């Protein structure tokens, strides 16, 4: 701390609102790095899966084609969006996705696939990380320095994941065949473990984000009655939205439905904020809509692969009907036992 104070003594006096803008930018950068790491790891898993399927070599070639400029644009745009997005709307986005994710996971037994969750949660994950940082560093004496440390660590993880993604796209086929590279051999043996690892990491991230989101929203209320006037319509609105979207996605799991779901969610949140929110929240909802659409466009190829994989899993795993013993009857002097299939 003495070194920081000594170093800060040489800096000119800067207004407090400037440091607030810097902190928002740093929080947005950490959130953008988290989204990019999730994107890179999911891309590695889907690329290896497509390589192992002779019918998906075209998709593997599309995943192999990477652009450094597009990745830089992706991180930069998300950083700008998260830095402009208010913590209140970001917290609402996190809570809405958490409720929707629980509904989707519970409906897996009814035939709905869940592999798209890693891509559908991208923007919500960034909102959760930014919201958590805003809550955890509230009132911290050295908030900017802590956020700089978080940016350094997140950028290091992003660089390593981007490096692995690039290496796998170029050398995985050769190294896995020649048994040459340790990274490629590890992925050859354990690439199936990437989704469970991401699932556990997302559970922890959204658990912390949900707690921070509730705290961020409640800090604006002066009394319990005021909080209840906000939470009651919010809970009803979110519950109805989740039920409606879940039914629509099961009946029509298409690319158009994914974008339609985003507009329905943001439209419902917009109406809610016009009723119990502030005018700044309405502007932040449009910013959130831009971020959601951008994340879906950037992951368009991967979403299509996941959607096809979910459809193939449902086709290849038909429900098995249990066998029960039916009535016993006699024909031609012999006693036969009839077996009947009971539909589930």
Swiss-Prot record:
Keywords: Membrane, Transmembrane, Transmembrane helix. It is a multi-pass membrane protein. The chain crosses the membrane at residues 18-38, 75-95, 117-137, 139-159, 201-217, 228-244, 257-277, 282-302. Its main location: membrane. The keyword Transmembrane applies. GO terms for cellular component: membrane. It is found in: Membrane. It comes from the Eukaryota. The keyword Cell wall biogenesis/degradation does not apply. Belongs to the TMEM82 family. This is Transmembrane protein 82. The lineage of its organism: Eukaryota, Metazoa, Chordata, Craniata, Vertebrata.
């Amino acid at each position: 701390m003495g070194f920081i104070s000594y170093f800060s003594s040489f800096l000119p006096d800067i207004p407090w609102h400037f440091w607030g803008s810097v902190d928002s930018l740093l929080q947005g950068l950490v959130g953008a790095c988290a989204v990019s790491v999730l994107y890179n790891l999911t891309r590695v898993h889907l690329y290896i899966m497509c390589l192992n399927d002779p019918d998906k070599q075209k998709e593997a070639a599309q995943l192999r084609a990477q652009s450094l400029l597009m990745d830089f644009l992706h991180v930069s745009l998300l950083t700008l969006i998260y830095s402009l997005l208010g913590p209140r709307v970001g917290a609402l986005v996190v809570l809405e996705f958490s409720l929707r994710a629980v509904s989707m996971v519970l409906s897996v037994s009814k035939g709905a696939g869940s592999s798209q969750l890693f891509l559908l949660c991208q923007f919500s994950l960034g909102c959760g990380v930014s919201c958590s940082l805003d809550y955890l560093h509230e009132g911290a004496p050295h908030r900017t320095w802590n956020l700089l440390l978080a940016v350094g660590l997140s950028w290091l993880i992003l660089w390593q994941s981007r490096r692995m993604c690039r290496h796998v796209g170029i050398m995985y086929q050769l190294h896995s065949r020649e048994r040459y590279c340790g990274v490629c051999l590890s992925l050859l043996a354990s690439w199936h473990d990437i989704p469970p690892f991401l699932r556990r990491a997302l559970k922890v991230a959204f658990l912390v984000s949900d707690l921070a989101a509730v705290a961020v929203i409640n800090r604006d209320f002066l009394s319990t009655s005021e909080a209840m006037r906000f939470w009651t319509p919010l809970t009803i609105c979110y519950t109805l939205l989740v039920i409606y979207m879940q039914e629509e996605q099961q009946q029509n799991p298409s690319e158009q439905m994914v974008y339609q779901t985003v507009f329905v969610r943001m439209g419902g949140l917009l109406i809610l904020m016009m009723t119990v929110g502030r005018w700044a929240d309405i502007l932040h909802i449009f910013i959130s809509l831009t971020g959601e659409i951008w994340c879906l466009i950037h992951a368009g190829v991967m979403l299509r692969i996941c959607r096809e994989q979910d459809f193939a899993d449902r086709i290849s795993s038909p429900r098995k009907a249990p066998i029960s013993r039916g009535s016993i009857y006699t024909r031609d002097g012999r006693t036969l036992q009839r077996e009947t299939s009971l539909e589930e």
